Amino acid sequence: MLTQIYEIQTPEEAEVMIELGVEHIGSVILNADHCLQQALLDTVNTIRDSTSKSSMIPLFVDFEAICKVVDYYRPDILHFSDYFCDSSGILPVCEKHLELQSKVRDKYPELAVMRAIPVAQAGKGRFLPSLEAAKLFEPISDYFLLDTCIVADNSKAHNDQPSGEGFVGITGLPSDWATARSVVQQSRIPVILAGGLSPTNVQSAIHEVLPTGVDSCMQTNARDTNNKPIRFQKCMERTRQFVENARSA
Protein backbone atom coordinates (compact mmCIF):
# COMPACT_ATOMS: atom_id res chain seq x y z
CA MET A 1 0.00 0.00 0.00
CA LEU A 2 1.52 3.26 -1.17
CA THR A 3 1.64 6.03 1.44
CA GLN A 4 1.68 9.76 0.74
CA ILE A 5 2.21 12.44 3.39
CA TYR A 6 1.71 16.16 2.78
CA GLU A 7 2.89 19.46 4.26
CA ILE A 8 6.50 18.31 4.46
CA GLN A 9 8.27 21.65 4.10
CA THR A 10 11.80 21.08 5.49
CA PRO A 11 14.68 18.68 4.78
CA GLU A 12 14.55 17.47 8.38
CA GLU A 13 10.91 16.44 8.04
CA ALA A 14 11.66 14.81 4.71
CA GLU A 15 14.42 12.73 6.29
CA VAL A 16 11.96 11.36 8.85
CA MET A 17 9.47 10.51 6.09
CA ILE A 18 12.20 8.70 4.17
CA GLU A 19 13.14 6.72 7.28
CA LEU A 20 9.48 5.72 7.68
CA GLY A 21 9.44 4.52 4.08
CA VAL A 22 6.81 7.00 2.85
CA GLU A 23 6.66 6.60 -0.94
CA HIS A 24 5.31 10.06 -1.87
CA ILE A 25 6.45 13.06 0.17
CA GLY A 26 4.43 16.18 -0.56
CA SER A 27 5.04 19.90 -0.16
CA VAL A 28 2.71 22.87 -0.67
CA ILE A 29 3.40 26.22 -2.32
CA LEU A 30 0.86 28.76 -1.14
CA ASN A 31 1.22 31.53 -3.71
CA ALA A 32 2.92 32.39 -6.97
CA ASP A 33 4.65 35.51 -5.62
CA HIS A 34 6.80 33.47 -3.22
CA CYS A 35 6.99 30.19 -5.10
CA LEU A 36 10.80 29.79 -5.13
CA GLN A 37 12.00 28.92 -1.64
CA GLN A 38 15.41 27.57 -0.73
CA ALA A 39 14.08 25.46 2.14
CA LEU A 40 11.63 23.71 -0.18
CA LEU A 41 14.36 23.17 -2.76
CA ASP A 42 16.52 21.57 -0.07
CA THR A 43 13.54 19.41 0.88
CA VAL A 44 13.02 18.19 -2.68
CA ASN A 45 16.74 17.54 -3.09
CA THR A 46 16.74 15.47 0.10
CA ILE A 47 13.90 13.36 -1.30
CA ARG A 48 15.66 13.05 -4.67
CA ASP A 49 18.58 11.30 -2.97
CA SER A 50 16.24 8.58 -1.68
CA THR A 51 13.86 6.01 -3.15
CA SER A 52 10.86 8.20 -2.27
CA LYS A 53 9.22 10.60 -4.73
CA SER A 54 8.63 14.31 -4.25
CA SER A 55 5.21 15.78 -4.94
CA MET A 56 4.30 19.46 -5.04
CA ILE A 57 0.95 21.26 -4.92
CA PRO A 58 0.98 24.84 -6.26
CA LEU A 59 -2.05 26.72 -4.94
CA PHE A 60 -2.26 28.87 -8.06
CA VAL A 61 -3.15 28.28 -11.69
CA ASP A 62 -0.82 30.59 -13.62
CA PHE A 63 1.00 28.58 -16.30
CA GLU A 64 4.21 30.61 -16.22
CA ALA A 65 4.41 30.44 -12.42
CA ILE A 66 3.84 26.69 -12.49
CA CYS A 67 6.63 26.35 -15.05
CA LYS A 68 8.92 28.30 -12.71
CA VAL A 69 8.06 25.83 -9.96
CA VAL A 70 8.81 22.79 -12.11
CA ASP A 71 12.06 24.26 -13.46
CA TYR A 72 13.30 25.30 -10.01
CA TYR A 73 12.35 22.27 -7.92
CA ARG A 74 12.21 19.47 -10.52
CA PRO A 75 9.72 17.41 -8.48
CA ASP A 76 8.77 13.88 -9.42
CA ILE A 77 5.05 14.69 -9.27
CA LEU A 78 3.07 17.87 -9.83
CA HIS A 79 -0.27 17.83 -8.05
CA PHE A 80 -3.22 19.87 -9.33
CA SER A 81 -6.02 20.48 -6.81
CA ASP A 82 -8.15 23.07 -8.58
CA TYR A 83 -11.87 23.23 -7.87
CA PHE A 84 -13.88 22.61 -11.04
CA CYS A 85 -17.27 21.11 -10.15
CA ASP A 86 -20.14 21.49 -7.75
CA SER A 87 -23.57 20.00 -7.16
CA SER A 88 -24.78 21.49 -10.44
CA GLY A 89 -22.19 19.50 -12.39
CA ILE A 90 -18.90 20.21 -14.15
CA LEU A 91 -18.28 23.98 -14.12
CA PRO A 92 -17.23 25.98 -17.22
CA VAL A 93 -13.89 26.74 -15.54
CA CYS A 94 -13.02 23.05 -15.91
CA GLU A 95 -12.02 23.71 -19.53
CA LYS A 96 -9.28 26.07 -18.33
CA HIS A 97 -8.00 23.48 -15.87
CA LEU A 98 -7.96 20.77 -18.53
CA GLU A 99 -6.05 23.11 -20.84
CA LEU A 100 -3.56 24.10 -18.14
CA GLN A 101 -2.86 20.50 -17.16
CA SER A 102 -2.43 19.50 -20.81
CA LYS A 103 0.02 22.35 -21.43
CA VAL A 104 2.12 21.39 -18.41
CA ARG A 105 2.06 17.73 -19.41
CA ASP A 106 3.14 18.56 -22.97
CA LYS A 107 6.00 20.79 -21.81
CA TYR A 108 7.26 18.34 -19.17
CA PRO A 109 6.60 14.81 -20.47
CA GLU A 110 8.90 13.31 -17.82
CA LEU A 111 6.84 14.86 -15.01
CA ALA A 112 4.15 12.72 -13.38
CA VAL A 113 0.84 14.53 -12.94
CA MET A 114 -1.54 13.95 -10.05
CA ARG A 115 -5.08 15.30 -10.30
CA ALA A 116 -7.30 15.83 -7.26
CA ILE A 117 -10.84 14.59 -7.87
CA PRO A 118 -13.35 16.10 -5.42
CA VAL A 119 -15.59 13.69 -3.53
CA ALA A 120 -18.26 14.97 -1.16
CA GLN A 121 -18.08 14.12 2.53
CA ALA A 122 -19.57 10.89 3.86
CA GLY A 123 -23.23 10.47 2.98
CA LYS A 124 -23.27 13.17 0.30
CA GLY A 125 -21.35 11.49 -2.51
CA ARG A 126 -24.25 11.70 -4.95
CA PHE A 127 -24.14 15.51 -4.92
CA LEU A 128 -20.83 15.81 -6.81
CA PRO A 129 -20.02 14.46 -10.31
CA SER A 130 -16.85 12.70 -9.13
CA LEU A 131 -16.99 9.85 -11.65
CA GLU A 132 -17.62 12.21 -14.55
CA ALA A 133 -14.74 14.40 -13.42
CA ALA A 134 -12.38 11.43 -13.27
CA LYS A 135 -13.28 10.43 -16.83
CA LEU A 136 -12.45 13.94 -18.06
CA PHE A 137 -9.01 14.10 -16.46
CA GLU A 138 -7.86 10.48 -16.75
CA PRO A 139 -6.27 10.84 -20.24
CA ILE A 140 -3.93 13.59 -18.98
CA SER A 141 -3.22 12.26 -15.47
CA ASP A 142 -0.84 9.68 -14.02
CA TYR A 143 -2.52 9.51 -10.60
CA PHE A 144 -5.82 10.52 -9.07
CA LEU A 145 -6.08 11.81 -5.54
CA LEU A 146 -9.60 11.55 -4.14
CA ASP A 147 -10.07 14.38 -1.66
CA THR A 148 -13.00 15.70 0.31
CA CYS A 149 -15.05 18.63 -0.95
CA ILE A 150 -17.55 19.95 1.57
CA VAL A 151 -21.17 19.95 0.47
CA ALA A 152 -23.42 22.07 2.69
CA ASP A 153 -26.66 20.88 4.27
CA ASN A 154 -28.56 22.36 1.33
CA SER A 155 -26.61 19.95 -0.91
CA LYS A 156 -24.68 22.81 -2.51
CA ALA A 157 -20.92 22.50 -2.84
CA HIS A 158 -19.27 25.87 -2.41
CA ASN A 159 -16.12 27.28 -3.96
CA ASP A 160 -14.62 28.52 -0.68
CA GLN A 161 -13.11 25.29 0.63
CA PRO A 162 -10.73 25.11 3.66
CA SER A 163 -7.70 24.74 1.37
CA GLY A 164 -8.42 28.17 -0.10
CA GLU A 165 -10.87 29.56 -2.59
CA GLY A 166 -10.74 27.57 -5.80
CA PHE A 167 -8.94 24.50 -4.39
CA VAL A 168 -9.96 21.17 -2.90
CA GLY A 169 -8.80 19.57 0.34
CA ILE A 170 -7.57 20.36 3.87
CA THR A 171 -10.99 19.55 5.34
CA GLY A 172 -9.89 16.92 7.85
CA LEU A 173 -13.10 15.07 6.94
CA PRO A 174 -13.47 11.64 5.31
CA SER A 175 -15.02 11.56 1.87
CA ASP A 176 -17.90 9.36 0.79
CA TRP A 177 -16.10 6.04 0.54
CA ALA A 178 -18.76 4.40 -1.63
CA THR A 179 -18.22 7.08 -4.27
CA ALA A 180 -14.47 6.80 -3.85
CA ARG A 181 -14.66 3.06 -4.43
CA SER A 182 -16.64 3.65 -7.63
CA VAL A 183 -13.92 5.98 -8.91
CA VAL A 184 -11.29 3.35 -8.11
CA GLN A 185 -13.27 0.70 -9.97
CA GLN A 186 -13.68 2.76 -13.15
CA SER A 187 -10.15 4.19 -13.28
CA ARG A 188 -7.25 2.81 -15.30
CA ILE A 189 -4.64 4.83 -13.42
CA PRO A 190 -3.54 4.54 -9.76
CA VAL A 191 -5.94 6.15 -7.29
CA ILE A 192 -4.78 7.51 -3.93
CA LEU A 193 -7.42 8.06 -1.26
CA ALA A 194 -7.21 11.22 0.86
CA GLY A 195 -9.66 13.13 3.01
CA GLY A 196 -9.58 12.91 6.80
CA LEU A 197 -7.48 9.75 6.91
CA SER A 198 -5.85 9.11 10.28
CA PRO A 199 -4.11 6.26 12.09
CA THR A 200 -7.49 5.15 13.45
CA ASN A 201 -9.51 5.00 10.22
CA VAL A 202 -6.97 4.28 7.49
CA GLN A 203 -7.36 0.50 7.64
CA SER A 204 -11.14 0.72 7.34
CA ALA A 205 -10.74 3.12 4.42
CA ILE A 206 -8.38 0.75 2.62
CA HIS A 207 -10.72 -2.22 3.06
CA GLU A 208 -13.72 -0.19 1.90
CA VAL A 209 -12.23 1.67 -1.07
CA LEU A 210 -9.34 -0.59 -2.23
CA PRO A 211 -7.13 2.28 -3.44
CA THR A 212 -3.56 2.06 -4.72
CA GLY A 213 -2.44 4.30 -1.89
CA VAL A 214 -3.53 6.49 1.00
CA ASP A 215 -2.72 10.10 1.77
CA SER A 216 -2.67 12.03 5.02
CA CYS A 217 -2.17 15.69 5.81
CA MET A 218 -4.31 17.28 8.53
CA GLN A 219 -4.85 14.14 10.61
CA THR A 220 -1.10 13.55 10.96
CA ASN A 221 -0.33 17.16 11.88
CA ALA A 222 0.51 18.34 15.38
CA ARG A 223 -2.40 19.60 17.52
CA ASP A 224 -2.97 22.86 19.34
CA THR A 225 -4.40 23.23 22.86
CA ASN A 226 -7.91 22.78 21.44
CA ASN A 227 -6.86 19.54 19.70
CA LYS A 228 -7.09 21.21 16.29
CA PRO A 229 -4.51 20.33 13.60
CA ILE A 230 -1.75 22.91 13.11
CA ARG A 231 -0.93 23.67 9.49
CA PHE A 232 2.59 22.74 8.35
CA GLN A 233 3.57 21.05 11.62
CA LYS A 234 3.70 17.27 11.47
CA CYS A 235 3.28 14.96 14.43
CA MET A 236 5.87 12.33 13.65
CA GLU A 237 4.35 9.76 16.00
CA ARG A 238 0.91 10.06 14.39
CA THR A 239 2.56 9.83 10.99
CA ARG A 240 4.48 6.70 11.99
CA GLN A 241 1.25 5.09 13.23
CA PHE A 242 -0.54 6.04 10.02
CA VAL A 243 2.15 4.46 7.84
CA GLU A 244 2.33 1.29 9.94
CA ASN A 245 -1.45 0.86 10.00
CA ALA A 246 -1.73 1.44 6.25
CA ARG A 247 0.90 -1.20 5.56
CA SER A 248 -0.71 -3.78 7.82
CA ALA A 249 -4.24 -3.31 6.46
Task: Name what the model sees in each region.
Residues M17, L78, F144, D176, ...:
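Conserved, mostly hydrophobic/aromatic
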Residues L145, D153, V191, T212, ...:
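A generic "structured core" feature
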Residues G26-D33, R48-R188:
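Conserved anion-binding
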Residues I192-L210, N221-D224:
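A C-terminal functional module that forms or caps the active site or interfaces directly
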Residues L2-E13:
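N-terminal basic/disordered segments at the start of proteins
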Residues I57, S81, I192-L197, V214-Q219:
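Glycine-rich beta-strand-to-loop/alpha-helix junction loops that act as flexible
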Residues L40-I47, S88-V104, K156-E165, G169, ...:
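C-terminal helical cap(s) of enzyme catalytic domains, especially alpha/beta-barrels
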Residues E12-E19, C67, L128-I140, V202-V209:
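Short amphipathic alpha-helices and their capping/turn segments at secondary-structure boundaries
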